[in-house]
Design a protein with these regions (language model features):
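General structural signal for secondary-structure boundaries
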Residues: 1-3, 42-43
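Local sequence-structure signature of Cys/Sec-based thiol-disulfide redox active-site neighborhoods
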Residues: 2-27, 31-36
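Thiol/selenol-based redox catalytic cores and closely related redox-interacting motifs
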Residues: 36-117
Length: 117
């Protein structure tokens, strides 16, 4: 598994995301950093990430964001509707997400990323 590259969906303004990057670097691993706010994943990429995470779209939503509170709070959405919301508003995507091969983890707490190393 040592040759399988790591990718992190990262927001540098997020302390958890920075901590996850540091944990990976401290162990000598190289990682492809994707600033998902500048280069958001497509709807299909989100679906693939969710499959690797073993999560439903609603579980990946950051509910503290203004976009959530203004547009989605109190609403019951289908998985497809949540996927549309995450694709339209990448700020709603919980972070960091670290992917290695066919596995992924949500780095909350950041030490969760160690499961992939």
């Amino acid at each position: 598994m040592g040759d399988i590259p790591l990718r992190i969906y990262h927001n540098n303004r997020c302390s958890k995301s920075r901590a996850a990057c540091q944990l990976i670097a401290d162990r000598g691993f190289e990682v492809e950093v994707v600033d998902y706010l500048k280069t958001p994943p497509s709807r299909d990429e989100l679906r693939a990430l969710l499959d690797k995470l073993g999560m439903k779209p609603a579980e990946l939503v950051r509910r503290g964001e203004a976009v959530f509170k203004e547009n989605y709070a109190g609403r019951s959405l289908s998985d497809d509707e949540w996927l549309d919301a995450l694709a339209a508003h990448p700020i709603l995507i919980e972070r960091p997400i670290v992917v290695r091969g066919e596995r992924a983890v949500l780095g909350r707490p950041p030490e969760k990323v160690l499961e992939l190393l």
